């Protein structure tokens, strides 16, 4: 069963698991404990939780914060209780935003969480609820490129519109393409390595958002210099209501590799993605 099947990753999971029952929010509101408790879970051996409130900046507002905590923490807790009661495997999607990104080097699964914003706080709290279940996978990922709006599509639009954007150039990470993330999730579900937390992103040399934007612009026929860089500090000074982001979002992929998950380099995947987008 896929919960949150209409979202950026959920819709990709639905394609990757055609045999699954797909639930959208109208089918199951994970934030409502009574609804989750009454749901007919006994038929399902594995539940993939892709439900999440992911508007990082809106989560800083009062209404957004309430929505983030309701879905990301309370929703995860409700599913965790159902997993214990009905003994199904719960696979839960997490994020690099549970970390501050103030350390250097790749971040391991057992690094202490230290979120910088409400979204990260709510996700970290949800992770801790899922971790209490005996049969769980927490899949931490970052910088997802999937269905609907994403950074690469936004940069393509700017490139085609003749814009010259200024993009943050001191946050490092790797893109994660949704299809590759879903393939890794299928590997966990099918092969059942040890339960626990796994970092899953695309592999390759980390880059900044500005560096990725320049690659997109070049693919669209523009030039490197059409994308300017700036620091996160400068960005937040201009947009003080935006949520603070980690400077280091590079996740250690050793554990995932160790259980046989194939992790493709993000740069060839970006090239393939852009070729598809540019011929649409």
Give names to the regions the model predicted:
Residues 191-241, 274:
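Mid/C-terminal beta-alpha module of Rossmann-like enzyme folds, strongest
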Residues 8, 208-209, 232-254, 265:
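Active-site loop of classical SDR/Rossmann-like NAD(P)-dependent oxidoreductases
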């Amino acid at each position: 069963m896929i919960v949150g099947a209409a979202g950026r990753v959920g819709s990709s999971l639905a394609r990757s698991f055609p045999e699954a029952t797909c639930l959208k929010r109208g089918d199951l509101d994970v934030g409502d404990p009574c609804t989750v408790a009454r749901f007919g879970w006994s038929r399902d051996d594995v539940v993939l939780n892709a439900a999440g409130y992911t508007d990082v900046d809106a989560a800083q507002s009062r209404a957004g914060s309430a929505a983030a905590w309701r879905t990301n923490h309370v929703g995860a807790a409700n599913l965790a209780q159902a997993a214990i009661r009905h003994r199904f495997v719960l696979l839960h999607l997490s994020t690099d935003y549970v970390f501050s990104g103030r350390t250097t080097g790749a971040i391991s699964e057992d690094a202490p969480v230290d979120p910088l914003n409400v979204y990260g706080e709510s996700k970290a709290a949800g992770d801790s609820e899922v971790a209490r279940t005996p049969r769980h996978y927490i899949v931490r990922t970052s910088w997802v490129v999937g269905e609907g709006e994403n950074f690469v599509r936004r940069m393509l639009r700017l490139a085609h519109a003749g814009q010259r954007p200024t993009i943050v150039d001191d946050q490092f990470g790797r893109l994660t393409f949704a299809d590759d993330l879903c393939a890794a999730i299928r590997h966990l579900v099918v092969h059942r390595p040890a339960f626990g937390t796994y970092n899953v992103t695309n592999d390759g040399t980390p880059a900044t958002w500005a560096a990725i934007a320049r690659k997109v612009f070049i693919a669209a026929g523009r030039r490197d210099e059409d994308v300017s860089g700036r620091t996160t500090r400068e960005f937040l000074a201009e947009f003080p209501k935006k949520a603070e982001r980690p400077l280091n979002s590079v996740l250690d992929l050793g554990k995932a590799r160790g259980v046989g998950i194939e992790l493709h380099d993000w740069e060839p995947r970006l090239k393939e993605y852009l070729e598809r987008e540019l011929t649409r």
